[in-house]
């Protein structure tokens, strides 16, 4: 079967339709993942109270920081895989998968072990409220055990998306979420034959869901003889190739640092929020849960844009990349804008799902949403622009932009302006950071040199015109033919 048919071809066809059809399963995966977190928050909040809810909010920020650290490695591998698939070079794509998978899993295990050992120091650094500290410790320690499986599942799904398949990741994300949701109340309350584990039961449910799902997706991919699977002689590709590993690390670390910058800003704001007590912290935690839904369209579109742009870079279809970005921005404005409007209209009924109707935290959370939620429309445009430029290997400018807009502007506004406008500074710091990031990202997209960059030396930059009869740059003339590859 031709290479393009055994993977997903994102280099032909109408761009808006192709982008939307690819993005919808990614959006579905994001919806399920966020729904999972929200439903778990409902179980924890209703069964165990506001202190437990604060504990999971603090612990989830730590988890996001860990996932962000290894996110860049997965993204670099995804872009390289997408470029190779676009160039119809599946042997190179398998080499990238092997090198990246080994390094990715090793780093995940290191983080899990270190996190387990230093969990108290991490929570104390966060300034976790005293009444939530024991609960956060119990929850986070089990989450650290789950980290390798969570990261491995994430890696497999991102690689499949780079190869043009967003439906398979959606199916197995659904499996993980269903298992997590089902086991949460059973293990929290000890229903039926299950032990009563309290907040640790919520984390254990996550561990079960992630482990079963990653095993299942690997079994299915090997049973289907997926072209990127490593079997037989190809298992030797799990031994890291130094040259490829250097590219993955050098390009992946800045992308991972982007997530760390966002996490660091979130942790800083959470630390300030915690100083106002458990009630404000719980309100902010619920608002942040809802913000994950608002950001889902932009994140899904960004993932689709990144894979689609990278495949077109690999195929030498430079004429399509700008239109991919424009379509992504348009979809973000429509979808994210619609979610913000819905949140403004139905915020209190939604907040009532997490907290009792007489909780003062509902009023606080509603105000937080009014002040900050609209800014995610702007940040969504930034996400799409970043996804486009990193398809050619431009990873440092987005990092610098995030450092300025999120770490300096957002956290600086929250910290220094609270002496002027009180806790309002925390909520309005989000629009301040989003406006800054959009202005800088748009400037780099328009005037920056990302079109002349490349990730692998023998692959020409996007600005180089094709000079062979194949319609691809000279460096691609020896690409793997479109023949069956097992």
Residue ranges with predicted function:
Residues 26, 30, 42, 46, ...:
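Transmembrane alpha-helix boundary and packing residues in multipass membrane permease domains
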Residues 53-113, 150-169, 283-345, 379-401:
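Small-residue-rich hydrophobic transmembrane alpha-helices
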Residues 1-23, 81-148, 194-253, 309-375, ...:
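Short alpha-helical transmembrane segments in multi-pass integral membrane proteins
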Residues 27, 31, 35, 39, ...:
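Generic alpha-helical transmembrane segments of integral inner-membrane proteins
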Residues 44-64, 130-135, 199-200, 204, ...:
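Interfacial/gating helices of multi-pass transporter permease domains
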Residues 35-54, 123-130, 186-197, 256, ...:
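Helix-terminus/linker motif at the lipid-water interface of multi-pass membrane proteins
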